[in-house]
Amino acid sequence: LGKLSELTDLGVEVHFFTGNHDLWCGDYLTKECGVMIHREPLTTEIFGKEFYLAHGDGLGDPDKKFKMLRAMFRSRTLQTLFSALHPRWSMELGLNWAKHSRLKRIDGKEPAYMGENNEYLVLYTKEYLKSHPNINYFIYGHRHIELDLMLSSTARILILGDWINYFSYAVFDGENLFLENFVEGETKL
């Protein structure tokens, strides 16, 4: 958190897109570190290119149970009720919930890329692109897979992978966008 504060103190904008594990993050990062929190997708122009940036959680996912659960987690009423619980109980509940979620995946890994016609973030993006053809780059996290896919002659989707297993991130140099992987001792920042 100190490094985030150092960056924002230097005038670097730091944006954080909340996802399925961050729904209740509150305003701590904003108040203490100067981080801009985004709970919804953001469309922005950078060096003449149009970007659609989002965590990816809930975008195009057809699972009705997931949608209902997500709506419950985003409910201010339920958040208020949960915050009234003693931390001993709320932490226990949260940790058990996370453990149960991890155990659903026997190997502990995110499902592999399901293909262009089955990957729900790709399907969502293709549909969104029909009504927003000016967007050049769609960048997501959430799926924990690395993907760089051309959707048209002017539009691409990138799914970033993650910072725990792949150490992956996107770089835009003003002209080109590409995925990189941080390698300690080799990657120049």
Label the model's feature ranges.
Residues 1-6, 104-135:
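N-terminal short leaders/motifs
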Residues 1-46, 165:
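Core catalytic region of metal-dependent phosphoesterases/phosphodiesterases
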Residues 8-18, 97-101, 117-121, 138-142:
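A broad, low-specificity signal for short, low-complexity segments enriched in glycine/proline
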Residues 27-31, 92, 96, 105-108, ...:
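Short amphipathic alpha-helical patches
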Residues 34-40, 52, 57, 61-73, ...:
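Conserved beta-sheet core of the metallophosphoesterase superfamily
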